[in-house]
């Protein structure tokens, strides 16, 4: 698994806390839920930057750096959520269901204004 950390950071902020949750239906491994590397937030990683036109900039961490960590699927029902720091390696899985997966994300930070977030 290639670890992916989406770019939500700014030079002017030290931490971003994200709240990720399903919107219209539950999320699980079948429809591409969030996957996190348990305990991997304690280390700084080398990454490759992948700029996605009209999308988010992706920070790809090589799988060899994350293979020792347990991968946790965040299987969530409606009204359930996960909180995580921007330093946490994470990605969403592949949607095998054939039905679009919808989720919402809210970010909390100590900074005000527009971020260089890849949009």
Feature annotation, model-predicted:
Residues 4, 9-29, 51-52, 58-59, ...:
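Short, conserved beta-strand element in jelly-roll/cupin
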Residues 47-49, 78-83, 87-119:
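Non-heme Fe(II)/2-oxoglutarate
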Residues 10, 65, 95-97:
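Sterically constrained small-residue positions within well-ordered secondary structures
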Residues 27-89:
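Double-stranded beta-helix
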Residues 1-5, 9-10, 41, 90:
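Histidine-centered active-site/metal-ligand motif
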Residues 13, 39-42, 94, 113:
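Short capping/connector residues at structural and topological boundaries
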């Amino acid at each position: 698994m290639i670890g992916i950390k989406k770019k939500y950071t700014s030079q002017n902020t030290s931490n971003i806390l994200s709240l990720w949750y399903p919107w219209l239906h539950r999320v699980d491994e079948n429809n591409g839920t969030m996957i996190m590397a348990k305990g991997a937030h304690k280390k700084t990683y080398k990454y490759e930057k992948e700029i996605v036109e009209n999308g988010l900039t992706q920070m790809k961490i090589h799988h060899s750096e994350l293979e020792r960590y347990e991968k946790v699927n965040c299987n969530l029902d409606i009204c359930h959520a996960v909180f995580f720091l921007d330093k946490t390696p994470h990605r969403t899985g592949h949607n095998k269901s054939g039905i679009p997966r919808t989720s919402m994300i809210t970010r909390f930070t100590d900074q005000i204004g527009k971020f260089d977030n890849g949009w």
